Amino acid sequence: AKKNEIDVALIDTAGRLQNKKNLMEEYKKIINVLKKIDESFPNEVILVLDATTGQNAFNQVEEFSKIHNLTGLIITKLDSTAKGGVVLAICKKYNLPIVAIGMGEKEDDLQPFNAEYFSKALLGIET
């Protein structure tokens, strides 16, 4: 990306559980490679959380934060769970913004986060 003067490089990795230490080490390697290219990289680290994991999401954020500072969250599967409320507690504890939410499996089901819409959906208020 740098050689071709591209401003943005998106690195999407396979999902993994935070208790799989060998797989978590791969994230450290990615960060180290990026830092060799430019010490300021990565500029954004967004963790994608499955809303159905409930309280386990705290452990995920905690462990991923040990590898690199997170800058935001994407919350998926909000269309299939009532456990989305844990997201609010995570955002407060770790001071992280929600960047986007996933409300299905189609490409356009990933939407930029809208606090009003999210609040109403969480409370079961028709939007």
Positions of PLM-derived features:
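P-loop/Walker A NTP-binding module and the surrounding RecA-like catalytic core of P-loop NTPases
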Residues: 1-127
